[in-house]
Curated annotation (Swiss-Prot):
This is Probable dual-specificity RNA methyltransferase RlmN. Its main location: cytoplasm. The active site is at 92 (proton acceptor), 341 (s-methylcysteine intermediate). Its EC number is 2.1.1.192. Binds 1 [4Fe-4S] cluster. The cluster is coordinated with 3 cysteines and an exchangeable S-adenosyl-L-methionine. Pfam families: Radical_SAM, RlmN_N. CDD domains: Radical_SAM (cd01335). It catalyses: adenosine(2503) in 23S rRNA + 2 reduced [2Fe-2S]-[ferredoxin] + 2 S-adenosyl-L-methionine = 2-methyladenosine(2503) in 23S rRNA + 5'-deoxyadenosine + L-methionine + 2 oxidized [2Fe-2S]-[ferredoxin] + S-adenosyl-L-homocysteine; adenosine(37) in tRNA + 2 reduced [2Fe-2S]-[ferredoxin] + 2 S-adenosyl-L-methionine = 2-methyladenosine(37) in tRNA + 5'-deoxyadenosine + L-methionine + 2 oxidized [2Fe-2S]-[ferredoxin] + S-adenosyl-L-homocysteine. Reaction proceeds by a ping-pong mechanism involving intermediate methylation of a conserved cysteine residue.
């Protein structure tokens, strides 16, 4: 049976586990420091803990459960990792070099059931949720890469926007957030972490009550129900009116800005009237709204879509700006590698299938 990754425990949970096994609280603190401050690669490197405690840890936990399968490096410094999990499932993680630091995009599920018609992540249906440990391990793998090479760089920003719907794996994602945000561990600031959801309304409300200062992003991608339902199946369950009501509640409770992700699809959602509808939709919350216009990365399986022209994107941007909406055209990363989320995994799974036939 596969042992749980110790990365899956928050500091509080680690302390509770130690106390339940007859160990002192300060031992848990020592182990936590070895994991996240000294960032060791094995329990045997924890030089100030007893042999019996080391054995106890080795019997109950694994450290990093990921196995690297493929690494793609782009000319702009973006690195895309394909990892194999202990059950042979595969996930993707992306490192992006930004002006403000190193940002990592993590995956939260093996596959995705949300079924957005433009997305490579949903080409392979959800097999299971990732554990909190498997999500934390993605950050640790990237950080170890820099540590091992003596590079004085650290992961400073995290976006929970990889394969899967984070709020469909809510409990594990929340434990992941608490672990990486812990000031005695990786200490990645809450305001440097963004969680994206396609619009699971009950979980948006729950997230508003969580007390975490983590940023929220909404994968909106359309300004009206007709267009959104045609490209995002989730809109049937949670139409725009319900989604916006939940966001209004979130803003009222947290007073935090919400980012709206908007993939630009040629002749689908990119016309000036769509931009005006979006501006009207956000008018009552424009002080705490931020629109991220995203150039579409074409996916061969979704050839009904193509990216909007630069002219269409700029016109859309101008309409939003004239309406007082804060917006930006997202800078592209890794365009010379499998840039679309889920693309690398999908390609590799196809290769494996052919190989095994």
């Amino acid at each position: 049976m596969q042992k749980e990754s110790i990365y899956g425990l928050t500091r509080e949970q680690l302390v509770d586990w130690f106390l339940a096994h007859g160990e002192k609280k300060f031992r848990a603190t020592q182990v936590w420091e070895w994991l996240y401050t000294k960032r060791v690669a094995s329990f045997s490197e924890m030089s100030n803990i007893s042999k019996s405690l080391m054995t106890l840890l080795e019997e109950n936990f694994s450290l990093n459960p990921l196995k690297q399968v493929i690494v793609q490096e782009a000319q702009d410094g973006t690195v895309k990792y394909l990892f194999e999990l202990p059950d042979k499932n595969m996930i993707e993680t992306v490192l992006m070099r930004q002006e403000y630091g190193l940002s990592v995009c993590v995956t939260t599920q093996v596959g995705c059931n949300i079924g957005c018609t433009f997305c490579a992540s949903g080409l392979l249906k959800k097999q299971r949720d990732l554990t909190a440990g498997e999500i934390v391990a993605q950050i640790m793998w990237v950080q170890h890469y820099f540590d091992e090479r003596g590079l004085d760089e650290r992961v400073s920003h995290v976006v929970v926007m990889g394969i899967g719907e984070p709020f469909d794996n809510y409990a594990n994602v929340m434990n992941f957030l608490r672990t990486i945000n812990d000031d005695k561990g990786l200490a990645i600031g809450a305001r440097h972490i963004t969680v994206s959801t396609s619009g699971l309304v009950p979980k948006i409300r729950e997230f508003a009550d969580s007390g975490l200062q983590v940023n929220l992003a909404i994968s909106l991608h359309a300004p009206n129900n007709e267009v959104r339902t045609s490209i995002m199946r989730i809109n049937r369950s949670f139409p725009i009116e319900k989604l916006m009501a939940a966001i209004d509640e979130y803003i009222e409770k947290t007073n935090r800005r919400v980012t709206f992700e908007y993939i630009m699809l040629s002749q689908v959602n990119d016309r000036p009237e769509h931009a005006q509808q979006l501006a009207d939709l956000l008018r009552n919350k424009k002080k705490l709204s931020y629109v991220n216009l995203i150039p579409y990365n074409p996916v061969s399986e979704h050839d009904q879509y193509s990216r909007s022209s630069k002219e269409a994107v700029l016109k859309f941007y101008d309409v939003l700006k004239k309406n007082g909406i804060n917006c930006v055209i997202r800078k592209e990363h890794g365009t010379d590698i499998d840039a679309a989320c889920g693309q690398l995994r999908s390609k590799q799974m196809k290769k494996e299938k052919v190989k095994n036939q």
